[in-house]
Amino acid sequence: MTIDTKFEHSPLLYLKKASGLLSNPVSAAEGRDMIIRTLDNRELYKNYEILLKHLVRKAGLYPYLNTEFKNHDLEDIISIEANKPNLNNDIVFHAIQTRVFNELLSGKNVVLSAPTSMGKSEIISNILTPERYRTVVLIVPTIALIDETRKKLVVMLGEQYRIIHHNSQSHDEHEPAIFILTQERFNQRKDLEKIDLFIIDEFYKLGFKYDKDGVLKYDERAISLNISLSQLLKRSKQWFFIGPNITSVKGLFSLVGDFTFICSNFRTVSVDVKEYNIPATDTDRKKEVLLEILNECKDEKTIVYCRSPNAANKLAQFLMSGASFEASYNDEFIDWLSKNYDPRWNYCQSLKHGIVLHHGVLPRALQHFSVDIFNRSRRHNLLICTSTIIEGVNTKAKNVIIYENYNGLESIDKFTHNNIKGRAGRMYKHFVGKVYCLQAQPEEDDSDELVVPIGDDGSNCPLNLLGSIDIDHLSSGALSSWEDFKKTTIIPIEIIRNNSSFEVEKIESLLIEINSVRVMDFSLYKKLNFFGKPTTEALYFIMVQFIAARKNVLTRNGFSVTSKNDKDPVLSICGKFRAYIAAESVDDYLTQQMNWKYNKLIESQNDKQEIDEQMSGVIDDELKIISNVYGFSFPNFLSLFSDILFHLNFKEKTGLKFDYGPLINDMEFQKLTAGYAAIHEMGIPHQTLEKIRKELININESSVEELSEAINEKYHSIVSLNRVDRYFIHAAML
């Protein structure tokens, strides 16, 4: 929507129209949108300040009443004070924030579906007090969101609560605490029996997805979140669900009874949407239009959404090849990237040209830096990113360009498309954002309707989910299915519950394979019972089973699992894993892999540009493997393997002992101790942490708090740290 030309020379007529729309609940959103646009064109309405102020108040936009107008009358003051969540607070809520706050304050359970710009985090930070909620659990979908939320709550509530964001941190039930965890981390904790309030952010992720034929897509993360929901409902006094663009919720009432569902389209910024309807395959036309838009918005903060990190890299390379983005930026951060990664890396080259990349492959520290430099640098007005745009990235972008309607290989639905569009504009910064859709918008569908699987009839719930939720949350049909399964399965139920992300069929298959080795090849079975690092034979067997259980994970992250030229792919994968296991640090591993790849490229070709591009790809590929495979999927699988091995040893009285714990931790914590791994998640890169570790001696490396305190106290005096290292530390430690 834009201000209609017939109103341009009649501000009074425009305000009268807006007032009429605001008076009708059906059209109030349109009236509010008109009022926000007047704030973006204040000069036109300078003669109608009192009327405009009245309409801002009528629209429920009390924060703007507080910040955009100087002369407040009694009615203004009453409205402002009535919408402050706490006495003497500088925060002023808008109408929907106040409604949600009051519902929670009265002890009700609330499901809130509202736009991204609605200000949900302000509700959380203002509702929480130790007197009201002593133990709070906040479930967020990603580690990136853990850190974004941690930073906000440390500033707002750090003196009142202990903020627990990593499972290496213990909990004293007598101490007020806020847990910020992914669903997987919550499910691992055994110290949260009594909870006063739990919050699920992005609650729409509870729902299962289906392919075009109606077949369930197996989603281990949705399963984990439903398990968390079941456990939290049994342990918590009150709950609050937050997310965007959901119009109905099915299956929740049967679990919890009464709750308040607030579905609001209340926005604090307006958005203009322009559609180009370019066919997905017409890349030349899309690039042409993209250049036109970027030229039009060259002095404004603009986000371009792409389907994948590879697509983002290619688009950045295309823009760098033109005249609009010259390599004019060079500073000590570029030098740091060149030294610690490679000067040929596309992330580094893009920054030189004023282009910022942001995607899930990047280490946490660089993701933070990308957002920071985009928000504050006048030379970096373009951010090219992937679905990370809707996973905890808060920017000052005025414009969003949706370059393609895909997330990876899959088309995005209307829900996700709306979520991306919601990133345009920023309260107090840009009253009106702009969205450019290069392809046609997705058709209307039911993606805005959430069905909570464990509260539905349970017929579509995998057995590993049914076995891991509270029995009171099973429907009669689901309970019958679970009881029938228990009568015939060879898997101990505790193994299913401890490894709930794995389908029971895969757990059973792995148990059979390991037991077969015990029976047929006991010498190999003994080698599986290792301490420290596996032998070549043990690693090979483990890898065969890992491929069988997580083939899609490996192929998605660049591993070839099929034979080529009579070469055994398992040997190749084992070699790569062995190199990582043997490496002293992530930095050492990266250097080894890059040197190996560079030597192979030099042997096979002489084209420097091709070599440079491939070397850039090597860094991205390895970072993705480190994060997704070494750091998550493989240690997760080793935990399952270990549980089965322990079960067989106990059942068959083999007398064998083993300990996979050190290897699992070494993989999961990316060559760091538990405490340093938590610090790394906060945004300090491996390279900087290695310098710190050499200086901080006689300290408990498993304690996040002790390490944080020591780093904050001593990093200024550590000579080996340069200004870039100190930037990362300061940004992470606040």
Region locations from a protein language model:
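N-terminal helicase ATP-binding lobe
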Residues: 1-734
